[in-house]
């Protein structure tokens, strides 16, 4: 509190340094998220190989779709890191300008980066707060509400995604299933039916559902 009950404004340099620290912290959150998804991806790939050996083509396709969705999620997270790095570089420039002019400057580059970052669920709350602080400091203009809303990016399995599924299956099963870039139409070799294999069908389905749930949780 300053004189007469007014809140004293913080020095611009302190604001920039604090923003940079918050962004670096969120980058570490993104890094952890990427590692978690990639670890789960490796488990899914192993499961695809096992399902291929058992002749369970349906499970292979379902799991391959999960790999495609996970790859998209990881790509989005890497893109968000690039936007964060862009903001960090702009913050360094702001400090340089601050030393010369004594004030922070409006930045369209930061504005564009923050518009993208507020759409990332994993870091949305922090990025919203940072955006409001930057607006108050005059670095960016006020964002439209629809920039904050409209976060749900529904990934539809279109033709390109189907081709990617086929490629993944071909790759992971060493050609037993899928012929990139054709769509998946191949049948897996018929496995030998044993009592143990029949008994494990229900357990395999439960494992499949559990794996899908874990990946969905990591992506959300």
From Swiss-Prot:
<protein>
    <recommendedName>
        <fullName>Charged multivesicular body protein 3</fullName>
    </recommendedName>
</protein>
<keyword id="KW-0967">Endosome</keyword>
<keyword id="KW-0813">Transport</keyword>
<dbReference type="GO" id="GO:0007034">
    <property type="term" value="P:vacuolar transport"/>
</dbReference>
<keyword id="KW-0963">Cytoplasm</keyword>
<keyword id="KW-0175">Coiled coil</keyword>
<feature type="coiled-coil region">
    <location>
        <begin position="22"/>
        <end position="54"/>
    </location>
</feature>
<feature type="lipid moiety-binding region" description="N-myristoyl glycine">
    <location>
        <position position="2"/>
    </location>
</feature>
<keyword id="KW-0653">Protein transport</keyword>
<comment type="similarity">
    <text>Belongs to the SNF7 family.</text>
</comment>
<feature type="region of interest" description="Disordered">
    <location>
        <begin position="196"/>
        <end position="220"/>
    </location>
</feature>
<keyword id="KW-0449">Lipoprotein</keyword>
<feature type="compositionally biased region" description="Acidic residues">
    <location>
        <begin position="200"/>
        <end position="209"/>
    </location>
</feature>
<feature type="region of interest" description="Important for autoinhibitory function">
    <location>
        <begin position="168"/>
        <end position="169"/>
    </location>
</feature>
<keyword id="KW-0472">Membrane</keyword>
<feature type="region of interest" description="Interaction with STAMBP">
    <location>
        <begin position="203"/>
        <end position="207"/>
    </location>
</feature>
<dbReference type="GO" id="GO:0031902">
    <property type="term" value="C:late endosome membrane"/>
</dbReference>
<feature type="site" description="Interaction with STAMBP">
    <location>
        <position position="214"/>
    </location>
</feature>
<dbReference type="GO" id="GO:0005829">
    <property type="term" value="C:cytosol"/>
</dbReference>
<comment type="subunit">
    <text>Probable core component of the endosomal sorting required for transport complex III (ESCRT-III). ESCRT-III components are thought to multimerize to form a flat lattice on the perimeter membrane of the endosome. Several assembly forms of ESCRT-III may exist that interact and act sequentially.</text>
</comment>
<dbReference type="GO" id="GO:0015031">
    <property type="term" value="P:protein transport"/>
</dbReference>
<feature type="region of interest" description="Interaction with STAMBP">
    <location>
        <begin position="219"/>
        <end position="220"/>
    </location>
</feature>
<keyword id="KW-0519">Myristate</keyword>
<feature type="short sequence motif" description="MIT-interacting motif">
    <location>
        <begin position="201"/>
        <end position="209"/>
    </location>
</feature>
<dbReference type="InterPro" id="IPR005024">
    <property type="entry name" value="Snf7_fam"/>
</dbReference>
<dbReference type="Pfam" id="PF03357">
    <property type="entry name" value="Snf7"/>
</dbReference>
<feature type="coiled-coil region">
    <location>
        <begin position="197"/>
        <end position="220"/>
    </location>
</feature>
<comment type="function">
    <text>Probable core component of the endosomal sorting required for transport complex III (ESCRT-III) which is involved in multivesicular bodies (MVBs) formation and sorting of endosomal cargo proteins into MVBs. MVBs contain intraluminal vesicles (ILVs) that are generated by invagination and scission from the limiting membrane of the endosome and mostly are delivered to lysosomes enabling degradation of membrane proteins, such as stimulated growth factor receptors, lysosomal enzymes and lipids. Involved in late stages of cytokinesis. Plays a role in endosomal sorting/trafficking of EGF receptor.</text>
</comment>
